[in-house]
């Protein structure tokens, strides 16, 4: 290395390149290190003792602290439902679970740490070495200068930025800035309700049909039960092909409240039980309110969402919803609390004390329920490339494997204005003016209102959780959780910092619906922009739209002569293997990507600002990478990812990053030599933790990633499959335009009587009941009918195999009944009827994916509807029959929620998602003044008699005894039950835990 730095000819060549900067005689290493040297020190942060003053100085709203029941350890076998015992009984037989059911009350305290990570200190010297090699072999002065300017940008990025978790003061100022946006302070526009904007949820959903389309495929599950039914036993998992249908959970992420300090993987079963407690409580409360009143099945009070008045039924719906929310939040206050977590990011040193991005780390319970509602619809979202109908959506868009090429071709061929939308980002291209705009909402999360979240929920339910015929496959419990529960828990909710409970403006960033709600906001903005003629976003237009919608936004990037620059890039196409010639890279800022042209067509390159900050200020490995080998694997994947997402496009930088990756790989090989170490597992974990995991996961683990032909894998164009979006159908379950609410409820009640159980999966059961038990099946007493149906069918199914065995028969009898559709001879008449009715109808028009799931491998015939060999047909028929048998048995043994709710699934869930009140009177929390307070317990609003010390902490005491409301009596009754539960758990006394509902 010393030889190349001391070659006089190269030193002179470098001096000529930098002579205009007054550094002509300097050594290149000195120049590069000087460029990377920070010009300012990181500012001093405040202490936690100064937090109350900082909150007050920045006018941050603080709530009166809400307590929740303390955690207690309870033996798993005493807290688990029969389903949970079937799933985890053997594994957790002697273990405890941690549940928030203690008799004491707890107020959380959370103090996140803030740390600044040093930059990549070897970067200046490594770049100087590669650059000297570059100019030694270069005969093009223009290229030499251009490469130097690029390296200079990278080094300046290192001088001015650091990877850190920000500062406490930066967190406060970020919250204050969000409140400024939400409340219209300091020049911002106050958030507006839909009524103030002149729109309705139904109008917005019509826009979302175009801006956030969902495919016509049906979800893999029904949204109708507690979460433990989405986890499968080994037998069920073998048939389903997956261990569970829960949303993907990052096990290493924080569990949130009430499990403060724990990872999700550590409390997964406890969280599942607690979430089920909440779901059951909501179900019970809805039963008490929905299905009470007269015995007349057409009575609105019995079948409606509240006591309907002829004047304003929507107000009744609002009153009903508020009552349920009040009771739920008293028991589960932690579900609307999020830890205010400082996001690790590359921050400008100058912004250290003013800008720290906050992540709202939701309760695991809130995360589970919210993700379950959104997961299946989100998987089926379509975008501008995958939808057969027009959409500007970029949801699930990937620029790799031909995605960028296809998108750029749409832009190049455009004759009308092109608009694209992704979360809080929008992109507009004006072909006549040849100008590209990248637009970003100003702290978009703060613009989110509960109107927006309710509309998101209604869209997910009516588009994502309906059959192809438009029939709901969700019940009223989940409809309520989606429409009222999650919006209340995640929007204008509580952020915990120290022992302060801060009003979170808008939605908590990082909640399960962050992307969806932001996408709805941008959809509203873009449609209002369309209404005024789609003008270019000048300052006057921005002000006009912000005044109309209450949504503040800014133009992040303007690219003039955009098409011209793209065409120039295509004419200057350079192969990905060329790491000598500077490329033509066109700025787009499209989801963080720019574009160049290679042998694969238009190819994505990570935007320079993001790429250079990531190289100069690498993110340190998290605490989950504990061993020295794991940390090396993390650094290896980090450099491989940076090389493949963009560093490859910049000479000298590509060689530097490739050298780092190779060094880390060699170090790993030395460290694991003569040791047993699962390197593939470690690499997989590092890939999963990478911010570029979607890109890097396309590569193989069969050989070192730095040795693979990354360009062939990442950028080779592949066929993009297009799908039909869910059509806009005339659904008989929706209220008709000229129909009064009384007429609607009457019609729906009649429909409920005629259609007790919906969906083809219920047809055999309906037929069975009708034929075998006509009196019970057609009886007017609906409660008796439900009980009789459930008991009789369950009994028959449980005894079916035993009856066959007692007659010397096997399950082949059922199989033959399935194939022939005829009742088997020599079997009891009722049993023979049952065997035929429970045999699913066979079809020869199923897609190959269904055959693959039931065969266990793809059919040899590659046609969309494959023909099967006789052996394959037998295997398919047998597995199909067994799958349906297990599905029926599981459905009939489900928790009481589904058994009860399926009868009313069509009617009640449709009402909940169509009878939205004009304005919801959400329960509001009390705020308090923090001026001059050292802790939130001593401020005005608390009386000393309300506080008492327990275990060294100050907590709320019971209110004085007196006349109490029914809801308060219920809360105290449950508190007494929990106290008994806690005492028994502490003494080891055996007890049976009663279901909450």
Curated annotation (Swiss-Prot):
UniProt feature, compositional bias: Basic residues: 971-981
Post-translational modification: May exist in multiple phosphorylated forms.
Keyword Disulfide bond: no
EC number: 2.7.7.48
Catalysed conversion reaction: RNA(n) + a ribonucleoside 5'-triphosphate = RNA(n+1) + diphosphate
Disordered: annotated span: 950-997
Main subcellular location: virion
Residues noted as binding GTP in the record, renumbered to the chain: 256-263
Entry GO terms, CC: virion component
One Pfam assignment: Birna_RdRp_palm
UniProt keyword terms in alphabetical order: Covalent protein-RNA linkage, GTP-binding, Nucleotide-binding, Nucleotidyltransferase, Phosphoprotein, RNA-directed RNA polymerase, Transferase, Viral RNA replication, Virion
One Gene Ontology MF term: GTP binding
RdRp catalytic domain: residues covered: 420-616
Cross-referenced InterPro entries: Birnavirus_RdRp_palm, Birnavirus_RdRp_palm_sf, Birnavirus_RdRp_thumb, Birnavirus_RdRp_thumb_sf, DNA/RNA_pol_sf
PROSITE patterns the record matches: RDRP_DSRNA_BIR
GO biological process, one term: viral genome replication
Segments forming a coiled coil: none
Source organism, top-level taxon: Viruses
Biased composition (Basic and acidic residues): 960-970
Cell compartment(s), UniProt: Virion
Purpose: RNA-dependent RNA polymerase which is found both free and covalently attached to the genomic RNA. May also contain guanylyl and methyl transferase activities.
Subunit structure: Interacts with VP3 in the cytoplasm.
Name the UniProt record assigns to this protein: RNA-directed RNA polymerase
Lineage summary: Viruses, Riboviria, Orthornavirae, Birnaviridae, Entomobirnavirus
Gene name as annotated: VP1
